[in-house]
Amino acid sequence: MESQVAAAGAAETEAEAGKRPAMGSASQGSLVSAPKGAVRWQLLRQVLKQKQLDDHLRHVSVRRFESFNLFSVTEATKKGTEKEAGVWVQYTSIFYPKYSISVRHNSGSLNVEDVLTSFDNTGNVCIWPSEEVLAHYCLKHSHIFRDLAVCELGGGMTCLAGLMVAISADVKEVLLTDGNEKAIRNVDSIIACNKKTGVFKTPKISSRVLRWDNETDVSQLEGHFDIVMCADCLFLDQYRASLVDAIKRLLQPTGKAVVFAPRRGNTFNQFCNLAEKAGFSLQRHENYDEPISNFHSKLKKEGSDIYEENLHYPLLLILTKTG
């Protein structure tokens, strides 16, 4: 369900990653060349013209790798009206098949202003590999959420990981958030649809717009959550410090954050440095799940040109608030 908008935004992110010498990744020189920079504008023009991306344009997008094959995705029965943009699909865990949820993917288009000026559109129309991995992790470790208040930050158009917590754990409360209003309207629809089926284990599941750099958004929920989690939210320079601050303020005194993100040059390390300065204790894990590690090793061994560890393999970071 990859969108033209997501591909355009992702290609720009990849291009920016390749331009920054401070990122310190040996692979960056291969990411972007002058022709690929030009391709970014081809992608944007495709968005404006509402055309399908051709194979060449898809190849240069960071979004070209789509999944670790942790969920089966099948088209669901039409949930909304014909006027509503989007396709309803059923996400079912491959490893824990009793857990399944209906989500709506946005198949409509965003306008130019959405692409260029909205708060982080990267998660607005697709589920990124890191979100998929976080969702799988939540199912595998559902016991850690028992009787706790949980918040997902930057969950995009579906907040899939937070939804998995709500259907698998005996959780006290789940709040699904993103900084983009269109994303949260879609999440509202997903919650309403699935409430009708009785799939949630808690009645206290809700969503709201939460921008990490907005004092009002953060202060209203200060000290409320036992666990805060996010996936692939570390690469935007202008929001990284705000994300660390928001996590710290949203957590209770002994709270923890569960973060999945690829290295993306030096952006993962930059976030870790900010978190340490903010007083968090850190635990980093590269091998946190055998099937994911095996799939990762297989892709590396194959030398696939659609998969790049620096951009696609999520590391696990556990932050513990130490006061």
UniProtKB/Swiss-Prot annotation:
Coiled coil, from the record:
none
User: Which tissues carry this protein?
Assistant: Detected in most of the tissues examined, with the highest expression in the brain and muscle (at protein level).
Q: Where is this region: Disordered?
A: 1-31
Q: Name one GO cellular component term.
A: protein-containing complex
The UniProt record lists the EC number as 2.1.1.60
Annotated InterPro entries: CaM-Lys-N-MeTrfase, Methyltransf_16, SAM-dependent_MTases_sf
Keywords of this entry: Cytoplasm, Golgi apparatus, Methyltransferase, Nucleus, S-adenosyl-L-methionine, Transferase
What is this protein's record name?
A: Calmodulin-lysine N-methyltransferase
